[in-house]
């Protein structure tokens, strides 16, 4: 049994042929394909090597850069925007500010944080891409309360022109009110006083006998719904049904 199992990674071209033959299904290896075939087999499965065979850090960095170039040309990394200055792998992913802009931002954050007691570590992590701010709505679309809170047109309530009533106008209005009250009293006297129903019937009977047929008087008025036989007999006598 092999104690040091070897991990074999296929190239992107072989992965593409495998994915094409898999009935058109998208495989994860098609997107995240890493080619590390440039590494020598001795460096992959030999944990300890002699000092003569050890590579210098500069040569290892050069080999890693060449391997990253192959990675950039395949998978989802090919869709990332390319930088104008450098062609390294990190420049495709992270877009930092230039050195001059970064130094000014660090100095400004350091001066502001020294006054407040903080450090200047937050300035080094700032990116070159500024976050776009949302466009402000026009002034006429803002509500009335928000328009004058931020120093708008009306810092306070709008002035209202309230007319001042003079003493002469007040006296004239009082006289008009008194005259209207007097006219209302005269109209009530002309209409007559309110009388109960039986007195109205008595006055109408005194004027003419034809006004005696009224719902306000008669045999049924004294019954109040208790016995309607007298009402029935009175109606029959008046109509001639009963002699």
UniProtKB/Swiss-Prot annotation:
<dbReference type="Pfam" id="PF04520">
    <property type="entry name" value="Senescence_reg"/>
</dbReference>
<feature type="compositionally biased region" description="Acidic residues">
    <location>
        <begin position="22"/>
        <end position="32"/>
    </location>
</feature>
<dbReference type="GO" id="GO:0009751">
    <property type="term" value="P:response to salicylic acid"/>
</dbReference>
<dbReference type="GO" id="GO:0005737">
    <property type="term" value="C:cytoplasm"/>
</dbReference>
<keyword id="KW-0963">Cytoplasm</keyword>
<feature type="region of interest" description="Disordered">
    <location>
        <begin position="1"/>
        <end position="68"/>
    </location>
</feature>
<comment type="similarity">
    <text>Belongs to the senescence regulator S40 family.</text>
</comment>
<feature type="compositionally biased region" description="Polar residues">
    <location>
        <begin position="47"/>
        <end position="67"/>
    </location>
</feature>
<dbReference type="GO" id="GO:0010150">
    <property type="term" value="P:leaf senescence"/>
</dbReference>
<feature type="compositionally biased region" description="Polar residues">
    <location>
        <begin position="10"/>
        <end position="20"/>
    </location>
</feature>
<dbReference type="InterPro" id="IPR007608">
    <property type="entry name" value="Senescence_reg_S40"/>
</dbReference>
<dbReference type="GO" id="GO:0009737">
    <property type="term" value="P:response to abscisic acid"/>
</dbReference>
<protein>
    <recommendedName>
        <fullName>Protein S40-7</fullName>
    </recommendedName>
</protein>
<feature type="region of interest" description="Disordered">
    <location>
        <begin position="107"/>
        <end position="143"/>
    </location>
</feature>
